[in-house]
Swiss-Prot record:
NCBIfam families: PRK00033.1-2, PRK00033.1-5. PANTHER family: ATP-DEPENDENT CLP PROTEASE ADAPTER PROTEIN CLPS, ATP-DEPENDENT CLP PROTEASE ADAPTER PROTEIN CLPS1, CHLOROPLASTIC. SUPFAM superfamilies: ClpS-like. Binds to the N-terminal domain of the chaperone ClpA. Belongs to the ClpS family. Involved in the modulation of the specificity of the ClpAP-mediated ATP-dependent protein degradation. This is ATP-dependent Clp protease adapter protein ClpS. Pfam families: ClpS. One of its GO terms (biological process) is protein catabolic process. It comes from Pseudomonas fluorescens (strain ATCC BAA-477 / NRRL B-23932 / Pf-5).
């Protein structure tokens, strides 16, 4: 019986369509999971009366890779509107960036506040 199984297995590997017990004729396909884009989060800077504008520009350049011109525009939006979006990221990245900004601001003894908000 053992020898027959080996022959049958070899036969099945060479020509799987000729084996009677095989379920190859069955039209079953594994369902593919529907993938969705991860939810995005805005990283928001809030204005205060004590943090220098140059420090805000430095933070935007350092943590958000903005060039000087764009960092200055975002800083002015924070200053005039009270808040501005620094970037749009997945949740983990947004939380990390906000934490880094808040930690750097505290180490530099500035009350700058950065938070995340769900987009949309």
């Amino acid at each position: 019986m053992h020898a027959i199984s080996q022959i049958r297995l070899t036969f099945n590997q060479d020509r799987p369509d000729l084996h009677d017990d095989d379920s190859a004729g069955l039209a079953v396909q594994e369902a593919k999971p529907a993938l969705q884009a991860p939810p995005m989060y805005k990283v928001v800077l809030f204005n205060d009366d004590y943090t220098p504008m140059d420090f805000v520009v430095e933070v935007l350049e350092m943590f958000f890779n903005l060039n000087r011109e764009l960092a200055t525009k975002v800083m002015l939006a924070v200053h005039t509107e009270g808040r501005a979006v620094c970037g749009l990221f997945t949740r983990d990245i947004a939380e990390t960036k906000a934490m880094q900004v808040n930690q750097y601001a505290r180490e530099s003894q500035h009350p700058l506040l950065c938070e995340i908000e769900k987009d949309g």
